[in-house]
Amino acid sequence: MSILVIGANGGIGSKLVDQLKEDNVDFTAGVRKDEQVSELENNDIKALNIDVENDSIEDLTNKFQSFDKVIFSVGSGGSTGADKTFYVDLDGAVKTIKASEKAGIKHYVMVSTYDSRREAFDASGDLKPYTIAKHYADDYLRHSDLNYTIVHPGGLKDDAGTGKIKADLYFDSYSTIPREDVARVLKYVVTSDKFSNQEFQILSGESTIEDALKAYE
């Protein structure tokens, strides 16, 4: 089992890389800049240049050939302009989905926004383009030929993780979760053969990750 983490230099992705390395999982960190590749390799981490905005589907397909699983943890966030959001969070995601299909990826894990339903389009200000992009990227993944899991984390914090969460298809309220715990969830999902064609929201809670996700196995 070989895993590609796209967005390995991000807030969640970098924590996931640390956790996968600690557990001696076979993975490669996908990052956008050559200097990031060099820095990771200097720390004994396999790395690959993955630029979801500028790489073609053919480029990505060729890069994905040696992997079994892909995690998409790339995000422009709400602070960039709408154009960058659609280039990265929508078109970039769709290109990786198409490339994963062509490369025969066995499991594609998407890190989405907390709520990407159409009802969430009323998000104010800069978050609206981001929510729209995530909505259509998630929907494209659901209708692809891939075995997928979509993870919808709540508000992201830099606090130390607790390893305790709660999960549901849709919660009635909004709360937060440390990035470290989101990474733990991703590690648990991607190193398992379960969670086929499932999606769920995750927040800080009182249950272990294993117990919280039992309903989605």
Tell what function each PLM region has.
Residues I3-V25:
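N-terminal Rossmann NAD(P)H-binding glycine-rich loop of SDR-like oxidoreductase domains
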Residues I12, V70, V151, V182-L186, ...:
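Non-catalytic, hydrophobic alpha-helical segments
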Residues D26-T28, D34, T80, K84-F86, ...:
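Conserved Rossmann-fold NAD(P)-dependent oxidoreductase catalytic core, especially the SDR/UDP-sugar
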Residues V31-K95, A99-K102, V190-K194:
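NAD(P)H-binding glycine-rich loop region in Rossmannoid oxidoreductase-like domains
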Residues A93, D172-K187, Q198:
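Substrate-positioning beta->alpha
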Residues A120, A160-I165, V189-Q198:
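Glycine/proline-rich active-site loop of Rossmann-fold NAD(P)-dependent oxidoreductases
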Residues T149-Y170:
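Flexible, glycine-rich beta-alpha linker
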Residues E199-S207:
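Short-chain dehydrogenase/reductase
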